[in-house]
Amino acid sequence: MKIVVAKNIGFCFGVERAIRTVEELLDEGKKVVTDGEIVHNKQVMEQLTKKGLKVSSEMTDGEVFVVRAHGIPKDRLEELKKIFPEVVDLTCPIVSQLFKTAQRYAKERKVIVFGKEDHPEMVALRGYAPAIVTKVPFKLEEKKVVFLSQTTSSLEEYKEFVAAMIRMNEFEEAVFLNTICPVTVNREREVEELSKICDLSIVVGGKHSSNTGKLFRIASKHSKTIWIESPDELPADVVKYGTVCVFSGTSTPNSLIENVVRKLKEMEGKRDGTI
């Protein structure tokens, strides 16, 4: 079995920044509170809660409230500043830029965002600008529009959505902006190419992670593909595949990927009788 690990793996800079900041606050002995997953990764959240991070939508007792990487609505942010002595905004810079862009364009045209309506990033965005969030093309009366995208969406799927919207409607002015995170686009392209030479693709990441799900869908077009959160989920028959490729979402730590590779080698060793 040949194991090929993608070059673009591990945390993106926004996730790394968020986790590092929370760990530093906890190491200082501060009572740190948040209202959901800092990042969409179960193992990372378990580690942070063990260190003392409190997660609750109702919690008001704490010294520091940390805003998740996905962001929160503007009015909610202002409320939190009145409740907590310190609020640390860990919204990813690329996500923050999306919010500002939507807010700016909403003054002059209808904002249409390609994304999952219930995703935390999209919930937060609607707190900055009145926007239609959907992945399904539809008819619209407005003639002036701007197209934006959730930062973790597939670029190709986004382009297809915009093309369908333009075919279905008679817009006088339609602005198309690529607001997808370049880190996720690079991973998307690597998975698109590398999965073509794989007998099995393994995508490692949280089951609630949009960007991980995107990589899973792309790899599935070209090879047998599985989506796992931990090495324990590797199937026993993984050793039957000749070339196994390992990919990861942007909320997946390098340590977890290393553990998956280690487990694969152990399974191969047991099959060959070398362990």
From Swiss-Prot:
Its EC number is 1.17.7.4. Transmembrane segments: none annotated. Keywords: 4Fe-4S, Iron, Iron-sulfur, Isoprene biosynthesis, Metal-binding, Oxidoreductase. Binds 1 [4Fe-4S] cluster per subunit. The active site is at E121 (proton donor). One of its GO terms (biological process) is isopentenyl diphosphate biosynthetic process, methylerythritol 4-phosphate pathway. Signal peptide: none annotated. Pathway: Isoprenoid biosynthesis; dimethylallyl diphosphate biosynthesis; dimethylallyl diphosphate from (2E)-4-hydroxy-3-methylbutenyl diphosphate: step 1/1; Isoprenoid biosynthesis; isopentenyl diphosphate biosynthesis via DXP pathway; isopentenyl diphosphate from 1-deoxy-D-xylulose 5-phosphate: step 6/6. GO terms for cellular component: cytosol. [4Fe-4S] cluster binds at C12, C92, C181. It comes from the Bacteria. The keyword 4Fe-4S applies. (2E)-4-hydroxy-3-methylbut-2-enyl diphosphate binds at H40, H70, H119, T151, S209, S210, N211, S251. It holds the Pfam family LYTB. Dimethylallyl diphosphate binds at H40, H70, H119, S209, S210, N211, S251. Isopentenyl diphosphate binds at H40, H70, H119, S209, S210, N211, S251. Its cofactor is [4Fe-4S] cluster. It catalyses: isopentenyl diphosphate + 2 oxidized [2Fe-2S]-[ferredoxin] + H2O = (2E)-4-hydroxy-3-methylbut-2-enyl diphosphate + 2 reduced [2Fe-2S]-[ferredoxin] + 2 H(+); dimethylallyl diphosphate + 2 oxidized [2Fe-2S]-[ferredoxin] + H2O = (2E)-4-hydroxy-3-methylbut-2-enyl diphosphate + 2 reduced [2Fe-2S]-[ferredoxin] + 2 H(+). It is an enzyme of class 1 (oxidoreductase). NCBIfam families: ispH_lytB. Catalyzes the conversion of 1-hydroxy-2-methyl-2-(E)-butenyl 4-diphosphate (HMBPP) into a mixture of isopentenyl diphosphate (IPP) and dimethylallyl diphosphate (DMAPP). Acts in the terminal step of the DOXP/MEP pathway for isoprenoid precursor biosynthesis. Belongs to the IspH family. This is 4-hydroxy-3-methylbut-2-enyl diphosphate reductase. The lineage of its organism: Bacteria, Thermotogati, Thermotogota, Thermotogae, Thermotogales. The gene is ispH.
